[in-house]
C-alpha cells in the first residue's frame, strides 16, 4: 500500500533546507580530541548529508541554505556541484558570518562526541526572501531540518517554505535533527518543532526528539501514541528511532513496521542517521513497501558507521543493494527484520 503520493510531474525530487557545515574527523583514531593532530575535512550538517545521500542514490536534488562568503563556502558549493546538487538557491552570508565547524572525537567504536562551533553561523542567515515559491513548487518534497528552526531568520524561512509547499502540493518531510546548541529553552523547541510536525507528511526522529517535540502538548512517551497524535494532524508516516534497538515506522492506517540494524564493522558512533534518512526517502519515492524502505535505510546507516566520513561515504543504490544481499547471504534473510 502507498502511504504517500508524490507529484511525479515535478522536475526536482527533494529540496533539503537548512544547515551546511564543515566536518573535521580525526585520522588519529580512538584518542581524545585534545591529543588529536590530524583531521580530514568533509561537507557536513544533516541536511547537506541527506542531500548528498539522495544525489548519490540517483535523485534530482536541490538545496536551500546559506554558507559563508569565503573559501569554506566555496568548498561546499563546489562539492555540491560535483555531486549534481542544484546550488542556485544556496546563498552567501553578507556580514562575515562563518560556516559552522564540527570537530568529532572518536574515543572508541562505541563512544564518540561532537564539538560544534555555532556562534555567528551562516546557515542561520537564511532569510525568508531567499525562499522562492517557484523553486519550492518544482520539487516533489522538501526536507526541513529541525536545527534550522533554532534561530531567526532561518526559522521563518523554513516556515515560509512549509507554507509554500502546502500551497503547491509538495510533500513536507520533517527531520527533527535536534542539536542543543542555540536553543534557549525546551518550550521554544517544542513550539517550533510542533508547528512543523503538525504540517508534515513524514516525521523522522529519535524517541528523545519526539519527546522534545511533544514537550508542551503532553503526549506520553509511547511511540504508538506519539504517531497517532501527529497523524491526527495529517502525517502519513512517523519513523521513531531507538538506536541499537532499531526503528519503527508507524503508518496512518494504524500499522507499524520495525527494522533492526544490520551487523557492521563499526568505526564510529555517529553518521548513520543521515544515510538512513536519505535511503528511506529514496525508497519511498521509488514506491517500495515500508518495510523495504526501512531495510534500505538501515543498510545505509550500517555502511555509514563503518566509514570515516558521512557525506563522502554516502552509498549508491547498488552499493546498498549489494550490502543487503551480502548480509542476507551471511546472516539469513531476516537479518534486520524484527
Report the location of each language-model feature.
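Short, conserved phosphate/pyrophosphate- and ester-handling motifs at nucleotide-, phospho-/glycolipid
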Residues: 54, 206, 273
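Structural alpha-helical scaffold elements that stabilize or flank donor/cofactor-binding regions
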Residues: 134-135, 195-196, 231
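Conserved phosphate-binding/catalytic region of the ribokinase-like
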Residues: 1-14, 163, 215-338
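Glycine-rich phosphate/adenosyl-contacting loop at the front of the ribokinase-like
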Residues: 2-86, 265-267, 334-338
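Conserved N-terminal subdomain of the carbohydrate kinase-like
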Residues: 60, 64-144, 321-338
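Conserved beta-alpha-beta core of the PfkB/ribokinase-like small-molecule kinase fold
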Residues: 141, 147-228, 245-246
Amino acid at each position: 500500500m502507498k502511504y504517500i503520493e508524490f507529484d511525479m510531474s515535478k522536475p526536482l525530487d527533494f529540496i533539503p533546507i537548512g544547515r551546511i557545515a564543515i566536518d573535521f574527523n580525526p585520522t588519529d583514531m580512538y584518542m581524545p580530541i585534545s591529543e588529536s593532530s590530524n583531521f580530514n575535512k568533509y561537507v557536513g550538517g544533516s541536511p547537506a548529508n541527506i542531500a548528498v545521500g539522495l544525489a548519490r542514490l540517483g535523485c534530482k536534488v536541490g538545496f536551500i541554505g546559506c554558507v559563508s562568503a569565503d573559501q569554506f563556502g566555496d568548498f561546499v558549493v563546489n562539492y555540491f556541484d560535483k555531486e549534481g546538487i542544484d546550488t542556485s538557491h544556496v546563498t552567501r552570508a553578507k556580514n562575515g558570518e562563518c560556516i559552522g565547524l564540527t570537530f568529532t572525537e572518536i574515543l572508541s567504536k562505541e563512544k564518540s562526541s561532537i564539538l560544534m562551533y555555532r556562534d555567528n553561523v551562516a546557515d542561520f542567515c537564511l532569510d525568508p526572501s531567499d525562499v522562492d515559491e517557484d523553486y519550492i513548487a518544482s520539487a516533489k518534497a522538501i526536507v526541513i531540518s529541525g536545527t534550522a528552526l533554532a534561530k531567526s531568520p532561518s526559522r521563518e524561512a523554513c516556515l515560509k517554505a512549509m507554507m509554500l509547499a502546502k500551497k503547491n502540493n509538495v510533500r513536507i518531510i520533517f527531520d527533527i535533527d535536534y542539536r542543543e546548541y542555540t536553543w534557549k529553552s525546551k518550550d521554544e523547541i517544542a513550539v517550533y518543532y510542533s508547528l512543523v510536525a503538525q504540517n508534515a507528511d513524514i516525521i523522522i526522529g529519535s524517541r528523545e526528539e519526539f519527546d522534545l517535540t511533544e514537550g508542551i502538548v503532553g503526549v506520553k512517551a509511547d511511540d504508538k501514541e506519539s504517531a497517532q497524535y501527529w497523524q491526527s494532524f495529517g502525517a502519513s508516516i512517523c519513523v521513531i528511532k531507538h538506536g541499537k534497538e532499531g526503528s519503527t515506522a508507524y503508518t496512518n492506517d494504524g500499522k507499524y513496521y520495525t527494522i533492526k540494524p544490520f551487523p557492521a564493522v563499526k568505526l564510529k558512533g555517529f553518521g548513520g542517521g543521515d544515510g538512513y534518512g536519505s535511503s528511506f526517502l529514496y525508497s519511498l519515492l521509488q514506491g517500495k513497501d515500508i518495510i523495504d524502505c526501512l531495510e534500505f535505510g538501515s543498510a545505509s546507516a550500517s555502511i555509514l558507521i563503518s566509514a570515516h566520513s558521512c557525506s563522502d561515504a554516502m552509498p549508491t543504490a547498488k552499493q546498498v543493494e549489494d550490502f543487503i544481499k551480502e548480509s542476507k547471504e551471511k546472516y539469513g534473510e531476516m537479518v534486520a527484520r524484527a
